[in-house]
Amino acid sequence: MFDGIGFMELLLIGVLGLVVLGPERLPVAVRSISGWIRAMKKMANSVKDELEQELKIEQLHTDLKKAENQGLKNLAPELQDSIDQLKQAAESVNRPYQVEDAPSAKETPAKETATTETTSTENAKSDKPNG
């Protein structure tokens, strides 16, 4: 945590803090400073995680472009893995929409089939000669 500060430096800072702030305000100051340090570490870790995620997305995008250039044939295993990950992500995004659209999609083909059968029956009747 204190990479560049040795034990003697920490002791000196503690003694100076005790002299300047006094024994009553020193614990409060230490708590507030440790809270600030904790908040800064959280922000730094958050930024680091976001950057790693963006780099991963950029790598997947680059792999996808390479795969497109190769025509999706004879792909390297890491490129195929990236494509599989992207397909899974796309399926997970599209899945909620497919569940909502599924009942209307099932009803529509049945209606079209009935209409097609009626039309083909009428066409068959009109094709017969009246004679």
UniProtKB/Swiss-Prot annotation:
Belongs to the TatB family. HAMAP family: TatB (MF_00237). Its main location: membrane. This is Sec-independent protein translocase protein TatB. It is a single-pass membrane protein. The chain crosses the membrane at residues 2-22. It is found in: Cell inner membrane. One of its GO terms (biological process) is protein transport by the Tat complex. It holds the Pfam family TatA_B_E. The gene is tatB. InterPro entries: TatA/B/E, TatB. The keyword Cell inner membrane applies. Residues 105-123 have a biased composition (Low complexity). The Tat system comprises two distinct complexes: a TatABC complex, containing multiple copies of TatA, TatB and TatC subunits, and a separate TatA complex, containing only TatA subunits. Substrates initially bind to the TatABC complex, which probably triggers association of the separate TatA complex to form the active translocon. Part of the twin-arginine translocation (Tat) system that transports large folded proteins containing a characteristic twin-arginine motif in their signal peptide across membranes. Together with TatC, TatB is part of a receptor directly interacting with Tat signal peptides. TatB may form an oligomeric binding site that transiently accommodates folded Tat precursor proteins before their translocation.
